[in-house]
């Protein structure tokens, strides 16, 4: 049995080294020693209003994974492994000048800027005004303070948004291709305010009656009365979606247009010397993972740390996102490292 285990370990290490060598990267051997933790506190327990704390039967401590020379930022993180039968935590020490903080989809909806949920039955973002307001509270109380704390040290703070590369947002925010002047920003802000506040935020009403078959009424019912239907007035999704007013945007922060694709984002990050990404934003189960700046893309090229309490999942049929966020961030931890806001700290000299 020991020979078998040793053989598997050697084979695994050889395969890892061979794979890394093929990519022309310097290799090292990671000693995967797992030490059982005794009575650890729940994970993600700093903001239980927004994220249900994570508790698992077994938790381990592993050796440091990322250990940069000249590191000035500590990012403790964890992942889950069914094979290890538990959660594995490890310290990381990274260089902030090689780090980008990215917020996925901070939509400025129902936040006072003008873009708002169409009535009586329109949807956008978390899909009801009440849910959007709750997400705004989370942004103000959790994400914005984190960005303010990290911005002075990290290389980049970035936001990803939907919509075309329009002339308003390209002059309102710094983008991958252009940094607007103060005059351009002022003019763009006025244009944004006008565009968002002159649109008629109406939607189709709920259907009051419709035909259903006698044979399959359930099928017909959901075909004609969907739980998430496009009822917004034409032109709604063509409006220039701003970064939410709940974020304190700085002139050096960079806007990502999803429509331009991941390759452009990747190249921009690499051109700026980025190796690490601290990822925040919405929604954990959708945009946070699967859009242009989501972790499914970024984790192919960078050391990605998902900030588990700086994201919210969509929460249909619930008054709180805490359980949905717990479930989706837990699932992500099978293949991603998860940290939390209180675990991201300056390295003590």
Q: What do these predicted ranges mean?
A:
Residues 22-101, 106-125, 129, 140, ...:
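Active-site-adjacent betaalpha module
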């Amino acid at each position: 049995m020991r020979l078998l285990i040793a053989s598997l370990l050697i084979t695994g290490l050889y395969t890892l080294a061979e794979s890394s060598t093929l990519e022309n990267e310097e290799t090292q051997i990671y000693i995967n020693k797992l030490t059982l933790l005794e009575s650890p506190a729940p994970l993600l327990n700093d903001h239980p209003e927004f994220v249900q704390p994570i508790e698992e039967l077994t938790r381990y401590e592993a050796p440091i994974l990322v250990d940069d020379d000249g590191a000035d930022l500590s990012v403790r993180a964890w992942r889950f492994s069914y094979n290890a039968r538990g959660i594995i935590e490890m310290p990381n020490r990274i260089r902030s000048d090689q780090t980008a903080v990215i917020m996925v989809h901070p939509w400025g909806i129902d936040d006072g800027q003008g873009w708002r949920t169409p009535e009586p039955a329109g949807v956008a973002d978390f899909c009801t005004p009440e849910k959007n307001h709750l997400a705004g509270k989370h942004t103000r109380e959790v994400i914005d303070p984190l960005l303010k704390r990290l911005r002075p040290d990290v290389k980049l703070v970035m936001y990803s948004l939907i919509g075309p590369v329009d002339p308003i947002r390209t002059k309102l925010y710094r983008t991958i291709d252009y940094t607007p002047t103060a005059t351009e920003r002022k003019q763009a802000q006025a244009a944004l305010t006008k565009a968002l506040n002159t649109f008629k935020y109406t939607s189709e009403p709920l259907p009051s009656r419709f035909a259903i078959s006698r044979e399959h009424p359930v099928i017909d019912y959901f075909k004609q009365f969907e739980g998430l239907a496009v009822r917004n007035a034409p032109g709604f999704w063509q409006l220039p979606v701003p970064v939410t007013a709940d974020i304190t945007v700085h002139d050096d922060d960079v806007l990502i247009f999803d429509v331009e694709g991941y390759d452009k984002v990747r190249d921009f990050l690499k051109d700026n010397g980025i190796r690490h990404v601290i990822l925040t934003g919405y929604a954990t189960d959708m945009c946070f993972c699967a859009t242009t700046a989501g972790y499914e893309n970024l984790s192919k090229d960078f050391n990605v740390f998902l900030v588990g309490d700086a994201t919210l999942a969509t929460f249909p049929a619930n008054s709180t996102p805490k359980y949905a966020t717990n479930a989706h961030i837990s699932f992500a931890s099978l293949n991603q490292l998860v940290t939390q806001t209180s675990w991201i700290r300056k390295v003590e000299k």
